[in-house]
Amino acid sequence: MIAAHSCGVLKERFAETRSLHRHDAEQQVWAVPNKLLQGKGLCIYKDIACKRASAYQNGTTKHCLQKLLHPSELSIPLAAVILDSSKIFQEAVAVTAKQVQIGDRPCRIYGADCAEYLLLQMTDEHELQRMDNEVAAIAQGAAHPFLFAAVPVESWNDELSPWEAPAVWGKESFGGDAADTLHFLTEQVIPTLKQRFALPENVRIILGGYSLAGLFALWASTQTDLFYGVAAASPSVWFPDWMEFEQQRPIQTQHIYLSLGDKEERTKNIVMAVVGDNIRTLHSQLIARGADCTLEWNSGGHFKDADLRTAKAFQWAMEEHT
């Protein structure tokens, strides 16, 4: 095991690395939060800073450590502290959830400072119960460091619906308050996260969600070009007048993930039954406009594996497609 003195040296050196890179005008810095790594007699701080995620793929982390750490400062070979940095991020992101109060909403935040991607998802209490699992799944396949914000909504049907509509399931109608929700995101959530987590001004923002939150993400991207991408898993594209609205005011982002369960359109609800035809049409229209868009069919109905389906949506939206 590394002596306490050596652990302190490592922490100081990693802090020095972060400081140096924050003054690098050409590359953004990101850092994995502190976490003690136990295993194989090794105990070091996993506070490793380096340049953008691409650096993790070409060995920059190893190069940085080799320049800053000296064998005399360690009681074990230097190779033992050259860790798989992408794995570090995957492990750390799932255990670093924190609550940040933004306005009147307690937002749950995961991920890294100075991240290249900011992922936003409107959630209800039920989804929050599986959020750790969803974010861990995103991190497992992510090629880029990201900051993830789960933003709670109290009235799902009201806060995420773009306009008023009668109830289609049960007795709860739709209040049409999506404009207020979008204003809260753009004027409070995003600025707060950028400042608090040192996100670059040009951070790529992906708005995503499941069901009505997926529709909200699609609708929001008709109102602003702020979003780099949309991750819409099983979106409620059956919503009355949505397809006509999108034709008149098209989605502005160029990166759109769409998915649907292969049993979702097999419903006796005549309003919701159009979801399959609508999502096929929307996908075709977006492709015809030249958008980077995919439509994935998942096995099962609407309530199967919502967390994993949404994770796949965010993963795709962060990938580079040619």
Predicted regions and their residues:
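A domain-start/cap signature at the N-terminus of enzymes
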Residues: 22, 75-117, 146
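Short, charge-rich patches within N-terminal targeting peptides
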Residues: 54-63
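Serine-hydrolase catalytic machinery in alpha/beta-hydrolase-like enzymes
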Residues: 116-198
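Gly/Ala-rich beta-loop-alpha elbow adjacent to hydrolase catalytic centers
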Residues: 208-209, 213
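Short glycine-enriched nucleophile-adjacent loop
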Residues: 214-223
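A conserved short beta-strand
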Residues: 226-237
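The feature captures the conserved acid-bearing segment of alpha/beta-hydrolase catalytic domains
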Residues: 237-305, 317
